Design a protein with these regions (language model features):
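Exposed, low-structure sequence patches enriched in small/polar residues
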Residues: 1-312
Length: 312
């Protein structure tokens, strides 16, 4: 696969384009064994690579991935994938500012499912990633599905995720050095923890009258720390606030006041810590009162509580 969007390319009303000035390539090769063996009924091995450049010839990302999935003799299914990202230059981390270096990193993800033909099926997902700055992410999800009878089925899927991002963009402020074109591109460390659960229930009263219900409680919190500004274009190094002749302190409102002793400038960074609780649900009663004609009765609710001034 090879695709490109030239600088200044606009889709307007034709669709959505997240970025332009991109040249993207993808290559993948798979080996599939379909003859049952002593351990597996079938399996697949895959190798894939993806690369991106801008029209100036700067490599903006690369990734190499190896993955495999298997169907076992007992009809269980499993998957394992490993990926590696070498260093590159990002043209979007500074949100329209200078290029910023990215560091090498990698990750792994795996899943296993029991036999889906059974009345009870259990699935487990795990993923982890990391990079040379010390950033990391770990997530776990459990999927439990049961069919107690021919009329109904329910699914419970709790999940947990914790991430540590070493370069979370905060904003751009005036007063930077010539190395960053006289602007301050401010970043921070953010630790985020998320808990959620998906609940589904399907029930058939008759072939023409069915009930489908979905609910998802959700909780997430984030803590921002270790603020600093990009030291120079095409690097990943931050000039950490509180060092290098700078000070940082919280004011009574909880925001952070930064003073640069080199030029005497003072500016304020918002306190972006957040705690969010939400609950979404959807219930649909479908009645096919005659062949080809159906009535739907839908009840939805979406509740959210932001316990602090969060960060978007």
């Amino acid at each position: 696969f090879l695709g490109a969007e030239s600088p200044g390319f606009e889709l307007n009303d034709l669709g959505r384009l997240s970025s332009a000035d991109d040249i993207d390539s993808e290559f993948f090769v798979n080996y599939r064994e379909t003859q049952p063996g002593k351990v597996f009924r079938n399996y697949r091995l895959g190798l894939a690579t993806a690369n991106g450049w801008n029209f100036g010839g700067t490599r903006t990302y690369s990734v190499v991935r190896i993955n495999t999935n298997q169907t076992w003799k007992n009809w269980w299914n499993s998957y394992v994938g490993i990926f590696y990202r070498p260093a590159a230059m990002s043209d979007d981390l500074t949100r329209g500012g200078p290029l910023m270096a990215t560091v090498p990193g990698g990750g792994i993800d795996a899943q296993v499912f029991t036999n889906e033909a059974k009345n009870i099926q259990v699935g487990f997902f795990y993923s982890a990633s990391w990079n040379d700055l010390g950033a990391s992410a770990n997530s776990v999800r459990l999927n439990f599905r049961a069919r107690p009878g021919s009329r109904w089925q329910f699914t419970v899927a709790p999940s947990w995720r914790e991430s540590n991002n070493a370069r979370q963009y905060i904003g751009v402020y005036p007063g930077g050095t010539p190395a960053t074109y006289d602007e301050r591109y401010v970043f921070s460390w953010v630790k985020q923890t998320t808990l959620s659960m998906q609940l589904r229930l399907n029930y058939s009263f008759t072939p023409g009258l069915t009930l489908e219900a979905y609910a998802e409680p959700f909780a997430s919190s984030g803590n921002f720390s270790q603020y600093g500004e990009l030291a120079a274009a095409e690097t990943t190094t931050l000039r950490a606030y509180g060092t290098d002749n700078t000070t940082i302190a919280q004011d009574p409102s909880g925001n952070y006041v930064v003073t640069d002793g080199n030029n005497g400038q003072t500016f304020t960074l918002p306190n972006n810590n957040f705690n969010v609780l939400s609950y979404r649900s959807n219930v649909v009663l479908r009645w096919e009162w005659r062949p080809g004609s159906a009535l739907f009765f839908i009840w939805q609710q979406n509740r959210e509580s932001d316990c602090s001034a969060g960060y978007d």
